């Protein structure tokens, strides 16, 4: 294997990724909503320029069946049926192997004793709306 590492700023790299002009890249993507729809729409739905569909689909993955399941899961009100839809989607994505899932990043977060109201968030976001500083 012959590899050339090319560090890039994200704004330079993103159009290259969306146009399938890179063979590989490394990045994490946390779940910001505790719901599969936001993640799967961004990462695995077929990229459609000018829409939110596939806005983070840097694997250039396209599957009509997965696209169909994404739409079905997003509009399904029954939690059990919704889970079945997402499990089927997960199975298809796993079989197609559009990406190599390497790791889950570990985070260490700390704050000064002057910081109050802050707690780590399981969705990887830094929520500051309840934070305040003491003297």
Model feature map: region roles:
Residues 10, 25, 34, 39, ...:
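Aromatic side chains
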Residues 16-21, 41-71, 75, 104-135:
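Short, solvent-exposed loop/beta-turn-alpha elements that line the ligand-binding surface or hinge
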Residues 25-29, 76-113:
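Bilobed periplasmic-binding protein-like "clamshell/Venus-flytrap" ligand-binding domains
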Residues 1, 98-100, 129:
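Structural beta-strand/beta-sheet cores of well-ordered domains, especially the beta-sheet scaffolds
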Residues 1-7, 68, 72, 81:
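A local structural motif
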Residues 1-49:
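Periplasmic binding protein-like
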């Amino acid at each position: 294997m012959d590899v050339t590492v090319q560090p890039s700023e994200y704004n330079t790299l993103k159009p290259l990724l969306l146009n399938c002009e890179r063979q590989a890249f490394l990045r994490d993507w946390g779940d910001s909503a505790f719901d599969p729809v936001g993640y799967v729409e961004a990462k695995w739905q077929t990229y459609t320029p000018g829409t939110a569909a596939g806005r983070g689909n840097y694997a250039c993955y396209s599957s009509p069946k997965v696209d169909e399941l994404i739409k079905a899961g997003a509009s399904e009100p029954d939690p059990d049926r919704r889970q079945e839809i997402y499990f089927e989607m997960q199975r298809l994505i796993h079989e197609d192997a559009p990406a190599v899932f390497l790791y889950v990043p570990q985070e260490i977060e700390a704050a000064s004793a002057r910081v109050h109201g802050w707690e780590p968030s399981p969705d990887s976001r830094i929520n500051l709306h309840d934070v305040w500083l003491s003297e």
